[in-house]
Amino acid sequence: MVVEPLPEAFATLDAEVRELLDDRSAVLDAHTHLGLDEDGQTLELDRLLGFLDQVDAGARACVFALHDPDRRPAYRTPNDRVLAWAAAAEGRLYPFCRLDPADDPIAEGKRCLALGARGIKLHPRAQAFGFDTPAAKAIFELARDGGVPILIHAGRGMPPMDALADLAQRFPEVALVLAHGAIADQAMFATRLAGHPAVVYDTSIFSPFDLIELFARVPAERIVFASDVPYGRPIAGLFATLRVAAYAGLDAPERALVAGATMDALLAGRAPAAPTAPRVPAVRAVNGRLARAGAYLLMGFGAAMGSGPPPDATRVMPMVALARAVCRDPDPGAAGPALGRIDGLLAAAEGLAAQGSDRALAAIGLVMAAGVIAATDQSR
């Protein structure tokens, strides 16, 4: 296997991850993909393992199919590929079966669970379904009977998701992973499912403010690290998750829960640790200079992702230029060190973006990391 080298600019992110996490070999990425998507994204086994190796040679991941053109009938072919890839990964990958509620989901789910699938993936936007249906209820019954978690897309493109909360309340024994921090309806989920014993939220979120708000509303014991490969990178996602976790006041054992131990428990059929109260205040002071830089970076990221997969890193660069102008402030005050670090990451992102589309996600990862620093630095 050829390990993709970590771009030099990621070295400071990698160093901070080392400071914030004692055992990187225990990292478990809750949300990765393999195969081909209709949007053009693709990822093969060796490259996924290479991305995990950038974290640690022992890092692991949950994995499932993309919105594969070969998904009919019943996602059978993509599910078989994922099962085979996981078997070849020597214990580093936990395969989930992807199901379409409109295409024989129970028979396919039973088949995959019998072959070793460790969970179920549902994507209500891609498969255009709701949760107030007999098929959705039957899938929850399947997960309950099989003792496996369900990971559900709860990010962009979704309407209000109260029907899913209703279903979760009817099945308290089913472990749910709400992907993308449940940003489609985060406040509703955090309120209505606060007492659910096994609902967790993954951290594959592009906005640092959504991630901070997740830690402000949800106990640390209910948050699990995720990168959404191939749309993200584990090392960048882990940096963002751990930095926000530290900002939220999590100590080393709590950060270890987020990085892998909580997801390990769900996969083993155990309840996550008892929840503690979030410690991030609802109202938080910000440094105006860092807020300006961070706002430009969020706008740039939206422009890049709005271009459609694969993302166009060149579209973020006008906003990067504005953020770098903020970083050149001749009187930066207490924000000076953070602005200097942000400027270094953005300069490296410009260099990667100039190398072409193969480096686009690495460039965008650096922009995201810079945004996380802007949002979490404690300068006043």
Residue spans for each PLM region:
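Hydrophobic faces of well-ordered beta-strands that scaffold small-molecule active sites
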Residues: 27-32, 61-64, 93-97, 120-122, ...
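Mid-to-C-terminal alpha-helical segments outside catalytic/metal-binding sites
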Residues: 1-26, 30, 49-52, 57-60, ...
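Active-site gating/metal-coordination segments in enzymes
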Residues: 4, 73-149, 345-348, 352-368, ...
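Active-site environment of divalent metal-dependent phosphoester hydrolases
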Residues: 35-37, 68-71, 101-104, 127, ...
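Acidic (Asp/Glu)-rich catalytic clusters
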Residues: 19-24, 48-58, 78-92, 107-117, ...
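Divalent metal-dependent hydrolysis catalytic cores, especially in the metallo-beta-lactamase
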Residues: 30-33, 37-39, 43-71, 92-100, ...
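Catalytic pocket-lining loop regions of alpha/beta-barrel enzymes
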Residues: 3-10, 14, 119, 133-224, ...
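Conserved, mostly hydrophobic/aromatic
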Residues: 31, 52, 82, 86, ...
